[in-house]
Amino acid sequence: MWRSWLREAHQSFERLPYESKQDRVVEDISKAIMSIKEAIFGEDEQSSSKEHAQGIASEACRVGLVSDLVTYLTVLDFETRKDVVQIFCAIIRITLEDGGRPGRDYVLAHPDVLSTLFYGYEDPEIALNCGQMFRECIRHEDIAKFVLECNLFEELFEKLNVQSFEVASDAFATFKDLLTRHKQLVAAFLQENYEDFFSQLDKLLTSDNYVTRRQSLKLLGELLLDRVNVKIMMQYVSDVNNLILMMNLLKDSSRSIQFEAFHVFKVFVANPNKTKPVADILVNNKNKLLTYLEDFHNDRDDEQFKEEKAVIIKEISMMHA
């Protein structure tokens, strides 16, 4: 039965551009999509059939329905779009009995699927749907590697600064997933593309948008403190310009940004092999830093933070020219 639903959906999608009255075709598509969803996930309390789900994933990729789902997302109604997201994500996740992953392989063979999803961020109507499907794709390391190495990653920086809070936040969720899920892959990528990546990140850290500054600063701290990125961390904290940026963010009007900046600033101070420019800045600003840190977030009920702050204050107080 599910084969006929797949065939009906695919044929309807193919007819759609040539129909003068699309409403009826869209209605047929919506019904077929609902039936496909029920075949994958089960209806009501009934459990779904694993065999059906695997069959649907394979067939949807074979006939090109996966591309249809993302290409024509804009013409579907709100509820059908949600069904499409569920179906698409299931297809991308499904592993066959022989270990095959038809959804992953389809996307790798048809990278236009990724481009369509990515540029969906430009349409507020479907932006969040596209973001969710894009993130499902990059759960696969092969796809994440492709995205990091193509123009989409560079363009993603632009999506983080769009006017819409919802779209910018979703784009940042994608950005974070891409940089934290596959740690070894990302560590190698950051080492190879250090200058380009951090020059782009600096723009986010100095953005006029508060949310952009805070989220990018928090992500920076997470990246630097991850053991797999130790080489990146050492390179970052050796640059005096990065220290100056963090010292400025320590004094940001937002307490949240101050707090996130502290977690990066402490890495500069704790580094036993400081470069001379970094050490000079810390020594030259020693008294100001100590005065500022003594009263820094004293009302925060966080024992680990209090201990770390005490260590940083002690380390700075022991520094001398």
Swiss-Prot record:
Name assigned to this protein: Degreening-related gene dee76 protein
InterPro entries: ARM-like, ARM-type_fold, Mo25
Sequence similarity: Belongs to the Mo25 family.
Pfam families found in the cross-reference section: Mo25 (PF08569)
PANTHER family to which the protein is assigned, alphabetical: CALCIUM-BINDING PROTEIN 39-RELATED, PROTEIN MO25
Gene Ontology terms describing biological process: intracellular signal transduction
GO function terms (MF aspect): protein serine/threonine kinase activator activity
